[in-house]
C-alpha cells in the first residue's frame, strides 16, 4: 500500500475513534447523573411569582422548577384551590405543596415532577423546618 494513502487513513481513523470515545464518555456521565437521581418527596412553599419562574422552598433551600427563557422541569404543577393560593401578582403567587420529584442536588434544579398535591397554607406556615423567608416582592 502507498505510504501517502496510509497516513491520511490513520489520521481519519484516529479522529473517528477519539470522537467515539468522547461521545460514549459524555453519554455515560449523563446516564449516571440521571440514574443516581432517585424520586423523592419534598414539601414546602411553591412559588410562582411571574410567568415560568417557579420554585419550591423546603427545609433544604430553594429548588428551581422553572426559569423564564431557561430550565423547565417536566411534569405537572400542583392545582391549588382558592384557599390554598395567595395571589401577589394577578394570578401569580404562592402556596404550600408536596411534590414527588427527581432533582439535581448540585444545581438544586428539579428535573421531573412525577406527582404533586397542594396543601393548606397552614401546613407550611406551622412547619418549623421551613425557613422563615420573605418572597422577593415582600422585601
Name the predicted role of every residue range.
Residues 77-139:
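Beta-strand-rich cores of mature extracytoplasmic or soluble domains
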Residues 24-27, 138-139:
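N-terminal soluble segments of membrane proteins
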Residues 11-22:
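Bacterial N-terminal signal peptides
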Residues 27-89:
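N-terminal secretory signal peptides
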Amino acid at each position: 500500500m502507498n505510504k501517502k494513502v496510509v497516513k491520511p487513513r490513520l489520521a481519519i481513523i484516529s479522529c473517528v475513534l477519539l470522537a467515539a470515545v468522547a461521545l460514549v464518555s459524555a453519554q455515560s456521565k449523563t446516564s449516571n447523573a440521571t440514574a443516581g437521581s432517585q424520586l423523592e418527596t419534598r414539601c414546602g412553599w411553591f412559588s410562582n411569582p411571574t410567568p415560568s419562574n417557579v420554585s419550591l422552598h423546603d427545609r433544604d433551600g430553594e429548588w428551581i422548577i422553572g426559569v423564564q427563557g431557561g430550565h423547565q422541569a417536566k411534569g405537572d404543577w400542583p392545582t391549588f384551590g382558592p384557599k390554598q393560593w395567595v395571589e401577589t401578582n394577578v394570578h401569580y403567587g404562592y402556596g404550600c405543596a408536596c411534590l414527588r420529584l427527581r432533582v439535581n442536588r448540585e444545581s438544586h434544579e428539579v428535573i421531573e415532577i412525577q406527582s404533586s398535591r397542594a396543601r393548606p397554607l397552614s401546613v407550611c406556615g406551622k412547619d418549623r423546618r421551613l425557613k422563615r423567608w420573605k418572597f422577593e416582592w415582600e422585601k
